[in-house]
Amino acid sequence: MAPAMTLSDKEFQKMRNWAIKCLRTIGVETGGSNVQFAVDPVSGRMIIIEMNPRVSRSSALASKATGFPIAKVAAKLAVGYTLDELPNDITGKTLAAYEPTIDYIVTKVPRFDFEKFPSASGHLGVQMQSVGEVMAIGRTFRESLQKAFRSLEVGVDGLEPKWAFEEDPDLIRARSFDLTSLRFATAFRLLKIREAFLSGKTIKEVFEITKIDIWFLNQIKMLSEQDYEETLYQLKSKGFSDAQIARNARTSAEKIRKTRIKENILPSYKLVDTCSAEFEAKTPYCYSTYDYENEIEPIQGKKVIILGGGPNRIGQGIELSLIHISEPTRPERSADGVVW
């Protein structure tokens, strides 16, 4: 996720300095690189676990999350430009030398395809087992986390167990939960953690067996403490879908949707502008959230909407993204705007 919510400023600055020292030691003079760290939350011991002296999937994620075109800037630096010579394409006023700042939360969740490998244990370790990932942006961590799980296309409407769809919410809360099922990391352990909180387990109990940072556990627990007195707007701002709200209200998603529209509870759109709205953005890269202020104006005239293929999976990869990128550039397209 970005920004890193559980790192102290001292740890952040230490990582920054070590990353630069790592690049200098290896001999990377220009171009894109990423350095990954592991931090012991008890002792504070920090080690470098990986360094990629190239543009990678992590670079693509960082570019999407911040709006800063890492690959493009790296290529220009490689041919002799300097950062203070390159304009920021999004603002048109600042330079690439300025570090991007963000006023939102970005969450990445990996996509696994264990169901296609019945013999696989499903336990996660030091080896990469994901076949793709999704990235979601929200004003809060809870909102972006729920949006990310919905985007995985694994049959969930947010951060809740799959079996919750057919059961009474009160029965779920009364269910006894076996904490030992959280001992090992699995593809859907976060869903089981929410199940544990719904069953009445405390943050301390879950932390003792998972060692997941208490900040994250507290965020998931707050999602599990959905109050029936909360307004529809408050629930939507926490990332709950109409279907999730409907199940707890014992009604249909369509009724919730109609009520939202009637009460004018509609998503607004915020800009990813690299500068936390300090300067006007020229490029319409935005995300939806539930807030009273819209930062963009609707496109006038004829529009074309391009639907993505979702997260990578076995049998569906990045080749579909190439088709989506190429399609709007066809000469016969006469739309005034393209919505991705």
Regions inferred by a protein language model and the residue ranges of each:
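Glycine- and acidic-residue-enriched helix-capping/strand-helix junction motifs
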Residues: 314-322, 326
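Single conserved hydrophobic/aromatic residue that forms the stacking wall/gate
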Residues: 323-340
